UniProtKB/Swiss-Prot annotation:
Name of the protein this chain belongs to: Protein MRH1
Encoding gene per record: MRH1
Keywords: Cell membrane, Membrane, Mitochondrion, Phosphoprotein, Transmembrane, Transmembrane helix
All ranges on the Cytoplasmic side of the membrane: 56-62, 138-141, 189-204, 260-320
Disulfide bonds: none
Length: 320
């Protein structure tokens, strides 16, 4: 057997062998891990492209690129962890829909990737920030939307890790938080974007409509039949989650970067001042030196006094 054939046989995805899913009855296989590696490559590719393009821009024009780079790299780390079959815990399923011949208990233990929710916590606020920036949303309202988005992620993380039916309480609270953010954006931000050009308003409506559909319809459905209801196998669940994650936290943030740059920061109402580097490199204006204080001319004063004294003496002599 040639060396090349040996390397080919040794190659491949061995994440499941190196990091076995000990303690989980329902877990991903090498196919699920392969899909996670595919998602990882997508996030990494788009993140690197945006980073390369960012350094071709002036310092003050890079902020929109940062809003697209951040979610891509955060989810890149999350999917690297899941593809390596790490960042998960076994949780006993509440419903006995998925079964295997090797499980010892009914229902069995399902593999729950908490690393996915950590990725959401870091990446999900960025599409919301981008949409708010298109509308010129005030900072305090933007901060409110981000905080409620993080609240949604924490609630669903707890819901995925809870065995009892109380998981649906956290699920409902988290879904309510997503609805609150959607209402906030469609009232405050939409009222602001109506005052802008039709192109910006149309972009806002198209992209946020997609975000709302994925957040309020697709994600709840996915959670209900995967981590919540134990209907789909973890491989199928990974594909379902992966498609939604790619659209929401990879494709949308990446597409919004060139669109926002096309509109321009001034048109969107953002003006970034000169950077510290430019301020240091700029030549300093010459400082006018203060004029010296006028010194009294003592010689002139003495001459004036001598003249006055001579005149007074002459006047006295004439009087005599």
């Amino acid at each position: 057997m040639s060396t090349f054939e040996t390397l080919i046989k040794r190659g491949g995805n061995e994440a499941i062998k190196i990091n076995p899913p000990t303690g989980a009855d329902f877990h991903i296989t090498s196919r699920g891990s392969d899909w996670f590696w595919t998602c990882f490559c997508c996030y990494l590719l788009f993140g690197l492209i945006l980073t390369f393009l960012m350094f071709r821009k002036p310092v003050n024009d890079r902020f929109f690129y940062l809003t697209g780079i951040a979610p891509n790299f955060f989810m890149c780390i999350a999917y690297f962890t899941m593809a390596s079959n790490l960042g998960w815990i076994p949780v006993k399923a509440k419903y006995n829909h998925v079964q295997t011949s090797t499980q010892k208990e009914h229902p069995g233990y399902r593999q729950i990737f908490y690393s996915r929710f950590v990725g959401w916590f870091l990446a999900l606020p960025w599409p919301i920030i981008q949409i708010c920036m298109l509308a010129g949303t005030p900072f305090w309202q933007m901060a409110f939307n981000v905080c409620i988005t993080e609240f949604f992620t924490v609630c669903w993380l707890i819901a995925a890790c809870v065995h009892s039916t109380y998981k649906w309480g956290y699920y409902t609270i988290g879904l309510g938080a997503a609805i609150v953010v959607s209402i906030s954006v469609m009232t405050t931000s939409y009222n602001l974007v109506k005052q802008r050009d039709n192109d910006i308003r149309l972009t806002f409506l198209v992209f946020f409509s997609i975000i709302m559909f994925l957040w309020i319809i697709a994600y709840p459905t996915c959670f209900g039949i995967t981590d919540g209801g134990n209907v789909l196998q973890p491989d199928s669940a990974g594909i379902f989650y992966g498609i939604i994650d790619l659209i929401l936290m990879c494709f949308i943030p990446t597409l919004l970067v060139p669109i926002a740059n096309h509109f321009g920061a001034d048109k969107l109402g953002y003006h970034f001042g000169p950077s510290d580097a430019e301020a240091v490199m700029a030549p300093k204006a010459p400082v006018a030196s203060p004029r010296p204080a006028a010194t009294p001319n003592l010689s002139k004063d003495k001459k004036k006094k001598s003249k006055k004294s001579k005149k007074s003496k002459k006047s006295k002599k004439s009087e005599e």
